[in-house]
Amino acid sequence: MCGRYVNVTSVEAVEKRFQVTAGPDYTAAPPPPNTNVSHGDLAPVVTGDRPDALQAMQFGFTPAWAKKQFYMINARSEGDHNADNDPGYRGAMGILQKPMFRQSIRTRRCLVVADAFIEGPQREKLAKPYVVYARDGQRPFALAGIWDEWTDTATGELVRSFAIITTTACDTLQAIGHHRSPVLLDP
């Protein structure tokens, strides 16, 4: 699971790295630098429908059709396949069939801006955290994500939220005893 990550890079550096502009909707209430982004926090993303704009969304995905708000932080690329988290798995990407994610994975993908992510061994979890940076030292980098818009029927508030797409553990995470890895992208 990639349930926590770091985002402390300045807006100007993110704009340069991702070739985007933070518009008025972002700069009016930008997410603060955060060394422990977790579900419910606002964080910067770049969406496929607005690839030139830096946007702020809530970490913790809720699909548009949901009756109540969820905080799904991860979307498994394999869906229900590979239940044992076999790092050698090369089968179907079941995320395309999961009702929770199938619409967003097709039409609402995003880049999640991160400086590092935080993981722990499968047994100790975040009681023994490791901060994982990109191997080449590039900061910030992009994690693959999906997003959606959900309207709170009680308040009418529109909540734009995202989840990080995960896959089987990379060599680095296997070495610390973790079973999943966020999908890293080159922006």
What are these regions (language model features)?
Residues M1-P187:
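Short linear sequence motif anchored by a di-proline
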